């Protein structure tokens, strides 16, 4: 028995169960607005239940998990937490749509050194916003208060999503062939990738996040939420013979496009077919970043690259524009020689 007669509690160790319960009460409304008819029960159980939609004959489940990287540090520095949850959902669901999957449900993990209920509620509200945009249900999550693991009220988030696609409709890149057209679907900014380089550029250049650029502050440009493509992409998939979709995330063009290309093919991109959004021009100038490195780190204004038959490209672009997307023909698929790079940007 310790010489100290005072009784210790979990709260004395830095874990506030009451704060956790208060957070659950705060987020119930946000969770409710994401509900889908397939969801069984509410939050708070040991597991979350979800039926498969009855319209699928041979349903295939598609799963994904992701985070938002060091964009979180920027959100913490700017004390703005209500959109980072949208980023989290986007990074997960956009990875599902590349295989043609409709997102069904989403779960989140929120870890912090000291739970601030207001901050966590803002994050979860953003997650709910993202789920509404994606059409998936927020069915559960975990909040972990871990004193000594994180500095103060710093936090990290991770997301987990499951979607469904008809077995015969899985998009896996096997149909990609020379002569296919490539369509770009525009991004909303850097999305959630390249933020370690972005923060280094801010540090080295001494740039002020409150500096104005095209009517918005640099900070606002950089915290712009990742675009969620689910509803527009599902309509495109329904109407057109989509051969492959690449989500341009970490690794940029060079790493992500080859992931969906069969051996012996390459993507030939017309670098003059679009103008980089101003935030990318600013980052390149302030950081003196080479163009190749820009394409390797950032999406440079392109969130998705879609391969489809050439004779369907114009109609697909028109459909995407009707759905509010910025879309254009960005290139084509060509034959590649052995050991040749699978992405060529002219």
UniProtKB/Swiss-Prot annotation:
Gene3D superfamilies in the cross-refs: PurM-like C-terminal domain, PurM-like, N-terminal domain
Domain of life of the native organism: Bacteria
Cellular location(s): Cytoplasm
Pathway terms, separated by semicolons: Purine metabolism; IMP biosynthesis via de novo pathway; 5-amino-1-(5-phospho-D-ribosyl)imidazole from N(2)-formyl-N(1)-(5-phospho-D-ribosyl)glycinamide: step 2/2
Enzyme kind, highest EC tier: ligase
Cellular component terms (Gene Ontology): cytosol
Alphabetically ordered keywords of this record: ATP-binding, Cytoplasm, Ligase, Nucleotide-binding, Purine biosynthesis
Xref: InterPro entries: PurM-like_C_dom, PurM-like_C_sf, PurM-like_N, PurM-like_N_sf, PurM_cligase
GO MF term list: ATP binding; phosphoribosylamine-glycine ligase activity; phosphoribosylformylglycinamidine cyclo-ligase activity
Listed GO biological process terms: 'de novo' IMP biosynthetic process; adenine biosynthetic process
Signal peptide per UniProt: none
NCBIfam families hit by this protein: purM
PANTHER family, per database record: TRIFUNCTIONAL PURINE BIOSYNTHETIC PROTEIN ADENOSINE-3, TRIFUNCTIONAL PURINE BIOSYNTHETIC PROTEIN ADENOSINE-3-RELATED
Family label: Belongs to the AIR synthase family.
Protein name per its UniProtKB record: Phosphoribosylformylglycinamidine cyclo-ligase
UniProt source species: Vibrio parahaemolyticus serotype O3:K6 (strain RIMD 2210633)
Name of the gene this protein is made from: purM
